[in-house]
Amino acid sequence: MQENLVIVESPAKAKTIEKFLGKDFVVKSSFGHIRDLSKKDLGVNLDKDYEPVYEIPSDKRKVVEELSSLAKKTKTVWLASDEDREGEAIAWHLAEVLGLPIDQTKRIVFHEITKPAILAAIESPRTIDMNLVNAQQARRVLDRLVGFELSPLLWKKVRPQLSAGRVQSVAVRLLVEREREIIAFRSTPYYRVVAQFYAAADPDKTHFKAELSTRFDTREEAETFLRSCIDARFTVAKAEEKPAQRYPAPPFTTSTLQQEAGRKLGMSVSQTMSVAQHLYEQGLITYMRTDSVNLSKQAIGQCKEEIIKLFGEKYSSAHNYKTKTKGAQEAHEAIRPSYIERQTIEGTPAEKKLYDLIWKRTVASQMVPAELDRTTIVIDISGSDAQFVATGEVIRFDGFLKLYSESTDEEPGEEGSGILPKMAQGESVNPAQITATERFTAPPARYNEASLVKRLEELGIGRPSTYAPTITTIINRGYVVKQNKEGQKRSYVQLTLTGSKIAEKRLTETYGKEKNRLQPTDIGMVVNDYLESQFEPIMDYNFTANVEKEFDRIADGEITWNSMIDDFYGPFHKMVDHATTTQTTKNNQIRILGTDPTTGHTVKARIGRYGPMVEIEGNEGEKSRFASLKKGQLIESLTLEEALALFSLPRNLGPYEGEDLVIGIGKFGPYVRHGKSFASLARTDDPYTIGYDRAAELVREQQARAAAANTPLKTFAEEPELLIKNGRYGPYIAYKGKNYRIPKGTKPEEITLEACMKIIQTSKK
């Protein structure tokens, strides 16, 4: 009989831990959860106090059999799943399935996979914490009840094959509300005035920039102001210089890591968590699901040593950060490198980048603040109540900025000057030029993954372990899309006063460009509206946040999980019964856009079997005409003109080499048809606007590819039927009506007839 069996969640983690324990320990993986709620039915026994009905999935039976066999041959079993609620539940399921006594089985937890941490955990085991298990069990049961009862309703009332979840539905609501703010927004122009001044007494005429505190609604107002400045006097009303400090951000929590990795590295939330998981399992960083910003004394000491070594003692300053997040869970420390002295690692490019981000953020959190000088100069204008304001900021000592600067979700604005000249109150300044530029109010920005996580955290919705799955789920369900927008061109006016003359320029700019922004789909908006109308309490942000607090109370042992579920399920089930019997019509999902000027028939938009579409009704006895919406279009904001444009396909652009160029959209996307051949449009080509020259170019490219595919790379005089060709997946042998793949790494121009025949013979066996 062996001495010890340690069971962890992942094979990578098992491999790392096995290095630290001696020959008396065998380390095996459960590959995550080994049990889940039954999928055959509800999986919850409503008549037995919401008792869960668990089953072992078929793909986990072999794992369970192996672990069960090993456990029977082992004196001591150690359950070493992750230290959060999900990990505690995995430990409990293992104990139940393997027949281990709950109150005696050794449970060990560690925040980092290092030898000292593992050995310390072995020295101080505990038993399974049933409060944590019950908190996870409550979440799982509650989410199953909600999904099981809501999904059939959506099938019946909205569209088949839809589903809903408690947290996911609230996340979609956030996106829908933001989208409707954008749809309702009407951009208005205004004029922003900026001047370049210099001190009247300055022989060098050193310029500094100042902005007018007032904005103008119209060009006329802006031009009138500029004319008033021709003979005006400009005097310094206030010149103020103040020292300031900028403090480092605390070490990463799960949500701040997801946000910063999104902003700095362009990683999605799920990618960030996947990469962080790999780093953790290799023993390179601490546990990545945490809402704590605390660092251990040992980590703070290691940071100090590293800072002094790299930058000198004047850059070091220990900080003890306190976690402010309500309902912070069990994890004891922020995300940090396991070994602070290890500045770089080996690994994939993504692993290297994320580790570098974590290392810099951790070390910077223990550095001194940056010291700044902030200067403000206020300039009066004779004959006007408006003032120009110049701001400047100079870094006197970089402090933590030497290593790391936190990014934000804010749109980049106009920055103040760096160094401003020394000025005194009452001093005269002269304008080199004053410019009034037409600007436009902007709608609220769509959420990206990072800003959505931030908002969910602010509202108290979800926990470190749920942010990534929530976003992945709403995208996979088709309720939300992540997309880029190229932006549009617009012109704007710029008026510049130099001396006594005002010059006008008309310039162009791109606006509305977006990258990786989350937008609700039509079906996402319809489902959201239905759930809000029938299940208002469930969709309420405060209600959802309070449910999270109830889970926390279960974890703290303050309430029982069954009673918490009962308090929720009773009112919820009544709402389901009411919604089931309430007559709702699908007509509210149809939007009348207007009348087709050609036929005089009604044009409407709705969700059809294959997604959002527009319809022009036919005469009695005639079929209606249908067209799908373009990517990024929404039923709610679609105009009649945009809808009619969707019926412009197929478009005949005219003849080319004796055959018409016809643009259309087929099963595999937009195309140009030329006779019997088809060429796909590029992603940047719009089928509704593509011109003749571009379509002809695509046809020529397709013809060239077809010609190249038909031209052999090599032939053999001894065997004319055998040809070496280049296909879609690389070079291949064509022989007597059959094709044979050439092994990877073989140069087709150098292959011999003998080698070809050998490949053919081998393939036939």
Annotate the PLM regions.
Residues 81-83, 259-261, 289:
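Short glycine-centered, acidic/aromatic-flanked micro-motifs in structured strand/loop junctions
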Residues 258-260, 264-271:
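A conserved hydrophobic secondary-structure block that centers on an alpha-helix together
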Residues 53-57, 264, 459:
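Flexible beta-alpha connector loops of hexameric P-loop NTPases
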Residues 2-5, 16, 127, 151, ...:
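Basic, low-complexity terminal or inter-domain segments flanking catalytic cores
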Residues 1-140, 149, 319, 406-409, ...:
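Intrinsically disordered, low-complexity regulatory segments
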Residues 113-195, 241-245:
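C-terminal or mid-to-C-terminal helical accessory/interaction module adjacent to the motor/catalytic core
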Residues 217-251, 258, 424-430, 435-437:
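Metal- or metallocofactor-binding catalytic centers and their adjacent structured scaffolds
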